[in-house]
Amino acid sequence: MKQLSEKRKEKFSAKRVAVLGVLLALASAMFIVESLVPPLLPMAPYVKIGLANSVVLLVIILFGAADAFLFVLAKNLLTALAVSFFVLPFNLAGSLCAYLAMAAMYVLLYPKVSLVSVSIAGAIVSNIARTGVAVLLMEAPSLYIQLPFICGLSVLAGIV
């Protein structure tokens, strides 16, 4: 029983909470700065480079997939408060799908695949999810035509 309480204390240690808080602030700031930059594709303003997803990958590596899931939810809530709740469906879909792809690849395939590959997968899945949300909200299936080009950009974004 004593071991369980020690593990719980370690999970909620001041250092751990502080590091996660700093990383949350960093990811949120990166997203906010990225949202101030004009869209890369004027015809697809919902497509983002996804710099904050690199911080999510770091949280997966340092703290594990469970903490990273809560981190993604907190990041989306903070950025929605700071930027706009209008973009929340796009951001939440992109972030959660990128998280799922990166966590699965990291847990199941790393070190057989590189961290760059994990990041690229997260970027591709994020932009596919964002496009899917745009198709649903705008009722415009023709937006899927942009996916090959968007996925190409996602590879570049994942490398960054």
Give residue ranges: language-model regions.
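Short helix-perturbing small/polar motifs within transmembrane alpha-helices
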Residues: K2-L4, A18-L24, A29, F71, ...
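Helix-capping/transition residues at the boundaries of transmembrane alpha-helices
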Residues: V59-I60, Y106, Y110, A134, ...
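Hydrophobic alpha-helical transmembrane segments of multi-pass membrane proteins
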Residues: L88-L92, A121, C151-L156
